Amino acid sequence: MKEPPSFPSSFSSASSPSSSSIVWDAAAALAPTFHADDLRTARLTRRVLEAFQRNKVGSHHVLSASNGYGIGDCGRETLDAVARDLWDCEAAVVRANIVSGTHAIACGLFGALRPGETLLSCTGAPYDTLEEVVGTRGKGEGGGTLSDWGVEYAQVDLTEAGAMDWGAIEAGLQETKPSVCFLQRSCGYNFRPTLSLGDVRRLVTLVRTRGPPGCKVLVDNCYGEFVEEEGEPCSACVGADLMMGSLIKSPGGTIAPCGGYVAGRKDLVAKAVARLTVPGAGADNGSHLGSTNRLILQGLHLAPHTVGEALKSSRLIAAVMEGLGFDVLPPSSAPRRDFVTAVRLGDRAKLLAFCEAVQEASPIDSFVRPVPGHTPGYGDEVVFADGTFVGGSTAEMTCDGPLRAPHAVFCQGGTHWTQWALALENVVRKL
């Protein structure tokens, strides 16, 4: 595969021939894998298309909008039906007023837990922004955490290899008698593999056979949507009780301007939505202003394609950075469970240089230099390269990382894999 002709820009004009050849030679070697990714995208696109068709999505749904209470918004209600059908679960609620993946997860946890019950995290410490939701960081501030609410917390750490510790989980089920077992599929800011649907299914089986009666399995599914073809964590073939995620990641297709979802058991979805709005009103309230329904529906339709491009980007990032001698997870040849690629850079300067290179190659704010800082919800300084059309969208080309050892950068998204290819030219030059 030959590199494309150069064009004047702040980043490509400085790329050396060697940096270009490193990237495009890696892309050429990945061509057969990219073709397999395209076939997977086609199969998942068919599944989304069939869900739209079965629910008779029409122009009146796409063009519908609501204000005030939002009661009777046919577009919003049809969006929920499409998601429920697509993910093969009892209920799904997709809402613009879920502000983040963390917000969706918090709604699920507060809905499923009651004072005096126990939450068992089966994948170690929760993601940074969830620590203050649970109450493991910022305790005593009275901010309305699960801990403030009287929910006990316990965790089972992953193994040194980043796998679930099944023996310790079984012991934890017996010892803590949890009401909820929580699983985070993606790596977060940890240098470990993403967990598969097989891992989720195994946890569900373990909880059903060895856990206390009524124990529920909740899954943080951020970055996991539309990757594995068999379904999603809440699908009947896997069996989790509830999954939560963000529309400015995979299912929004880089078009949804905001929002998130909860999906799974009907009773748990209702309880989660009661935390989002109020008990009683639940899913019947919540306006979708202007073109919100169109943008979310269109993004959901495009999601298999944008995820497919992000998966190809993930493989290319891994191949290029492996070639430069860096540790990468997952390796370029490994199966993908999400589209996050973690690169262990080893020091602060390389982390900042990597993010600067990606920011320079972005369509938005290419002239801005990323600097580390304290971001609400995070305990450490974090640096972000996010020249995106939707603020904070990690379905678009982005990378970020905390300023702590091992100074890994976490790369996501890309509306087309060639966007990351051009950015990697700049990364290679800077490193």
Segments predicted by a language model, with ranges:
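Conserved C-terminal alpha-helix-loop-beta "cap" of PLP-dependent enzymes
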Residues: 322-431
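N-terminal mitochondrial targeting presequence
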Residues: 1-17
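Short glycine-rich or small-residue beta-strand-to-loop segments that form or flank ligand, phosphate
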Residues: 65-66, 92-96, 339-344
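Alpha/beta catalytic barrel-like cores
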Residues: 14, 19-26, 33-47, 51-52, ...
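Conserved PLP-enzyme active-site core in the AAT-like
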Residues: 18-31, 38, 48-59, 71, ...
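Short linear loop/turn motifs
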Residues: 98-99, 286-289, 337, 372-375
